[in-house]
Amino acid sequence: MDAILNYKSEDTEDYYTLLGCDELSSVEQILAEFKVRALECHPDKHPENSKAVETFQKLQKAKDILTNEASRARYDHWRRSQMSMSFQQWEALSDSVKMSMHWAVRGKKDLMLEESDQTPTDKIENEEQDEQKEIKKEEFGSTTEKMEQKESKSVEKSFSPQNPDSPGFANVNCWHLRFRWSGDAPSELLRKFRNYEI
């Protein structure tokens, strides 16, 4: 009982900090961080350093616990519960003792970005729809260009391009700009932004 009351957490107990990663890190990320830190403090590279062996063993233990799914779940549960005992003592307890202890466990951190729920077939269908939209835009663009050319020819006949003060010159340019604005279809990204889906 005294051990629990006098317990002080050590930095070596936080395996995520020891490896330099986060509780949301994947196994691949954990292994990559382990390799970097293991190369820095490997006992073979630093034979004169007496703490190199101890540090390497802690890194190895952290990697073993965090790369195993079951032991990582137990470690995360212990870490979030903030129990006043070391992880080794927690592991030594039987499941019945763990069940009889009541405490509030903090939840896991939320992801900053949501994972994609789309399946590969959904992505292919979306890509096909995007291609069809682009083809329609290109067709629409070529027809509008033809219309613009016809309009500009008729405008050239009725108004002098060298005289911008002629009565209908400004009106023609405004109509041209309005037509372009109405012809531009909003992109899918813009639609999602406007509908607060992003």
UniProtKB/Swiss-Prot annotation:
Q: Which residues carry this modification: Phosphoserine?
A: 160, 166, 182
Keyword check for Signal, yes or no.
Answer: no
Sorted keywords for this record are: Acetylation, Chaperone, Cytoplasm, Phosphoprotein
Major location (coarse)? cytoplasm
Region called Disordered, residue ranges: 112-167
Q: Which residues carry this modification: N-acetylmethionine?
A: 1
* J domain span: 14-79
Q: Which domain of life is it from?
A: Eukaryota
**Sorted alphabetically, which PROSITE patterns does this protein's record hold?**
DNAJ_2
The annotated regions of Basic and acidic residues compositional bias extend over: 120-156
The record's Gene Ontology cellular component field reads: cytoplasm
Where is this chain's protein located in or outside the cell? Cytoplasm
A Pfam family the protein falls into: DnaJ
Quaternary structure and interacting proteins, as annotated = Interacts with HSPA8. Interacts with TPH1. Interacts with TPH2.
PANTHER family, alphabetically? DNAJ HOMOLOG SUBFAMILY C MEMBER 12
Which purpose does this protein serve, as stated in its record? Probable co-chaperone that participates in the proper folding of biopterin-dependent aromatic amino acid hydroxylases, which include phenylalanine-4-hydroxylase (PAH), tyrosine 3-monooxygenase (TH) and peripheral and neuronal tryptophan hydroxylases (TPH1 and TPH2).
This protein is called DnaJ homolog subfamily C member 12
Q: Which gene encodes it?
A: DNAJC12
